[in-house]
Amino acid sequence: YEMNTRLVGSERCIRDSYNPMPNATAFPNHIENGYKGMLVVRSEIKSVCSHHHQPVSGVAYIGIIAAEQLIGLSKYTRIAQWCARRGTLQEELNNVIADEIQKATGSSNVGVYLQATHGCCENRGIGAHSSLTQTTVLRGAFTEDMGTKKEFMDNIKLQQEFAPR
């Protein structure tokens, strides 16, 4: 009985993502006086690999160039965690997070960089305990302007250097 209860609890991780996405109230960003720069948020994520049903644990770095709408800083993490709860592949997760951030903010300039460890690499097959997978999705200015891309990647390096351990 205890094992069945635990199994059901672990499966909730996958099912919970089908609950409605958390509300991300947008605020006007008055372009003439508003924030025009890049924002980069670091969010811890946990997911389940849809291929092997093994845990995935990592960090999402979400970059955005402010548009006409802003959302609260915690909303970036809420969106990333909500997207990650669904059983998915890391490559798909990048796109889903970018899509949801674009919807919430109205910005076409979004970058999502994921860095994660996968139970399917650690617990199965090769048993690679130090394996780390990195994936990136860049849209708008993050793709078109090398300076924007560099600023995003430099911000990630700084956050990795100063992140709590």
Regions found by a protein language model. Give the residues of each.
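C-terminal helix-cap and adjacent tail motif
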Residues: 131-165
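A glycine-rich phosphate-binding loop feature that marks nucleotide/adenosyl-phosphate handling sites
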Residues: 10, 115-119
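Active-site-adjacent structural patch at catalytic or cofactor/ligand-binding sites
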Residues: 19-81, 131-136
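Single conserved hydrophobic/aromatic residue that forms the stacking wall/gate
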Residues: 1-14
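Well-ordered alpha/beta subsegment
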Residues: 81-115
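C-terminal binding/interaction regions
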Residues: 119-120, 128
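Conserved RecA-like P-loop NTPase ATPase core
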Residues: 9, 53, 101
